């Protein structure tokens, strides 16, 4: 009993002192909040240049491959494009206020290569107006207490480089990207401490060069009749190979740039799913899970950790997979301070016995069938809405983080994207979308699994970014899919409206404010009940 009385006194004293400092208690009656995570854990929202900025013909910007793709093949992007997008170029100051309003720590955005170097080449000159835009953006973020988290390349290479030499199909891209990255470090490095080189090389290589459903829209004709040219059996491997070498070249520049602070970090952003066996009793389906993870993660992470591609991919792809020289392998190995993980969903996988070897392509090299249901007909998620693009499977995030921890030496990780989609088919009102209950549940459940991965499993995760701040241009889906914490009214001047998920994050991330008496009572009660009677 004496110990309980002492504990009660200590609790009340701590509560009173904390309240006097203008802070709420570090423990909460809610299941989860900011203080459920380690000190200095980074919470933020994510975006990208083409999906947000608009102003494609303003400020000296030249066309990117996405400008060309959306205008040449509008039917492949829902008849939409990023010409205006959500007009972030003109509205960034107001949008930064929205980030601050939610108590976010950081804002992840990408640099438009064609806005900074219109020809793609540093030797051809710099667009000063484009550089100034990003300097203004960075300054505005810092002024509002928000940390800039910069991605150098998010899929929007200048069209000029593709016209000249095929962009990432050519090793010439390595030096052009090196020069672009070095310029960015020199111009912005004194105010930016968190950098990533590339966003989702898997999606960029596979969707752009195997399936052809995203820019640059290349693939074998038999894969997608809309593709004008391409080779789905070789080009995805070649593009990722050159991309990895460009990444390593950029990291070399980062580590010798005198404008970069000593505590600055650089990484790359990967986008793996988690996988479960289609048939839990099938050994071949269990092996298929490992193979899926090797192709989805190991293809790009193994070279950075171990200096080479996984043996599984080398065996399967054979001479269609380029090889690294010894020097390149050494340059790649450990060329990161952290790994960004974009996690959204999971799939069931089964071993595929029926692969047409006469028509090689990256997707069939995996010898996998990706499925939405398992053998019993159960979905990976209880969310069985047929309009969903992504299915909620929070357990997959924890499993994925543990897989990376165990297989790749527990690297520092940031969850650089995690988000929930609403498909707008015209049958849902704005009010219903803003209610946003499912998005709140999605983030809450994923944060719970993330917290367990950190505190119970020892996964080295340092931050969590939601996709996205605003509804925006979602690539081949155009504006029909909404991921934002803020609703964008595309029919009424692109006005922004907070969804309930934005309000939920504001509460979840709250740092200050005196605790209410009821909260104080409940917190004391929780401590009291947790201490054994003596």
Swiss-Prot record:
Source domain of life: Eukaryota
Which GO molecular function annotation, any one, does this entry have?
beta-glucosidase activity
Write out the transmembrane intervals.
Answer: none
Top-level EC class: hydrolase
Residues carrying a glycan = 68, 374, 425
**Glycoprotein recorded as keyword:** yes
Q: What is this protein called?
A: Beta-glucosidase 32
Give the organism's phylogenetic lineage.
Answer: Eukaryota, Viridiplantae, Streptophyta, Embryophyta, Tracheophyta
């Amino acid at each position: 009993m004496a110990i309980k009385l002492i504990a009660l006194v200590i609790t009340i004293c701590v509560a009173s002192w904390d309240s006097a400092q203008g802070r709420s208690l570090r423990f909460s009656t809610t299941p989860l909040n900011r203080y459920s995570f380690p000190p200095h854990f980074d919470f933020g929202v994510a975006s990208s240049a083409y999906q947000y900025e608009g102003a494609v013909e303003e400020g000296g910007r030249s066309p990117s491959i996405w400008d060309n793709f959306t205008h040449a093949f509008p039917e492949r992007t829902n008849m939409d494009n990023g010409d205006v997008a959500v007009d972030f170029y003109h509205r960034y100051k107001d949008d930064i206020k929205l980030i601050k309003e939610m108590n976010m720590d950081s804002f992840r955005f990408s640099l438009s290569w064609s806005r900074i170097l219109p020809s793609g080449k540093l030797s051809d000159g710099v667009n000063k107006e484009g550089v100034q835009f990003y300097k203004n953006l960075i300054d505005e973020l810092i002024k509002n207490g928000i940390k800039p988290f910069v991605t150098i390349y998010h899929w929007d290479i200048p069209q000029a480089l593709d016209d000249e030499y095929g962009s990432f199909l050519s090793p010439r891209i390595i030096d052009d990207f090196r020069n672009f990255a070095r310029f960015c470090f020199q111009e912005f490095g004194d105010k930016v401490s968190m950098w990533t080189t590339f966003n989702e090389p898997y999606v960029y290589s596979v969707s752009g060069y195997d399936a052809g459903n995203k820019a640059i829209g290349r693939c074998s004709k038999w894969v997608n009749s809309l593709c004008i040219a391409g080779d789905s059996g070789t080009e995805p491997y070649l593009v990722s190979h050159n991309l990895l070498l460009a990444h390593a070249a950029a990291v070399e520049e980062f580590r010798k740039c005198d404008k970069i602070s000593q505590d600055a970090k650089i990484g790359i952003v990967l986008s793996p799913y988690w996988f479960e066996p289609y048939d839990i009793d099938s050994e071949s389906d269990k092996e298929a899970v490992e193979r899926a993870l090797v192709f989805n993660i190991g293809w790009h992470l193994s070279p950075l950790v171990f200096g080479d591609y996984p043996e599984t991919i080398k065996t399967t792809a054979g001479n269609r997979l380029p090889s690294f020289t010894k020097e390149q392998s050494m340059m790649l190995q450990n060329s990161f301070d952290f790994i960004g993980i974009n996690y959204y969903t999971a799939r069931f996988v089964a071993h595929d016995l029926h692969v047409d070897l006469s028509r090689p392509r990256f997707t069939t090299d995996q010898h996998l069938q990706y499925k939405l249901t398992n053998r019993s007909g159960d979905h990976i998620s209880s969310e069985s809405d047929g309009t969903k693009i992504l299915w909620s499977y929070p357990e997959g995030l924890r499993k994925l983080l543990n897989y990376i921890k165990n297989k790749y030496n527990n690297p520092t990780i940031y969850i650089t994207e995690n988000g929930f989609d609403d498909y707008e088919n015209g049958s849902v009102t704005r009010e219903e979308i803003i209610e946003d209950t499912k998005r709140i549940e999605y983030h809450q459940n994923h944060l719970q699994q993330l917290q367990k991965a950190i505190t119970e499993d020892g996964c080295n995760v340092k931050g969590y970014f939601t996709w996205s701040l605003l509804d925006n241009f979602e690539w081949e889906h155009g504006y029909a899919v909404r991921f934002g914490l803020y609703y964008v009214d595309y029919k009424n001047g692109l006005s922004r409206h907070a969804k309930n998920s934005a309000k939920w994050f504001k509460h979840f991330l709250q740092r200050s404010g005196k605790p209410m008496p009821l909260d104080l009572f409940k917190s004391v009660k929780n401590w009291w009940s947790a201490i054994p009677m003596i």
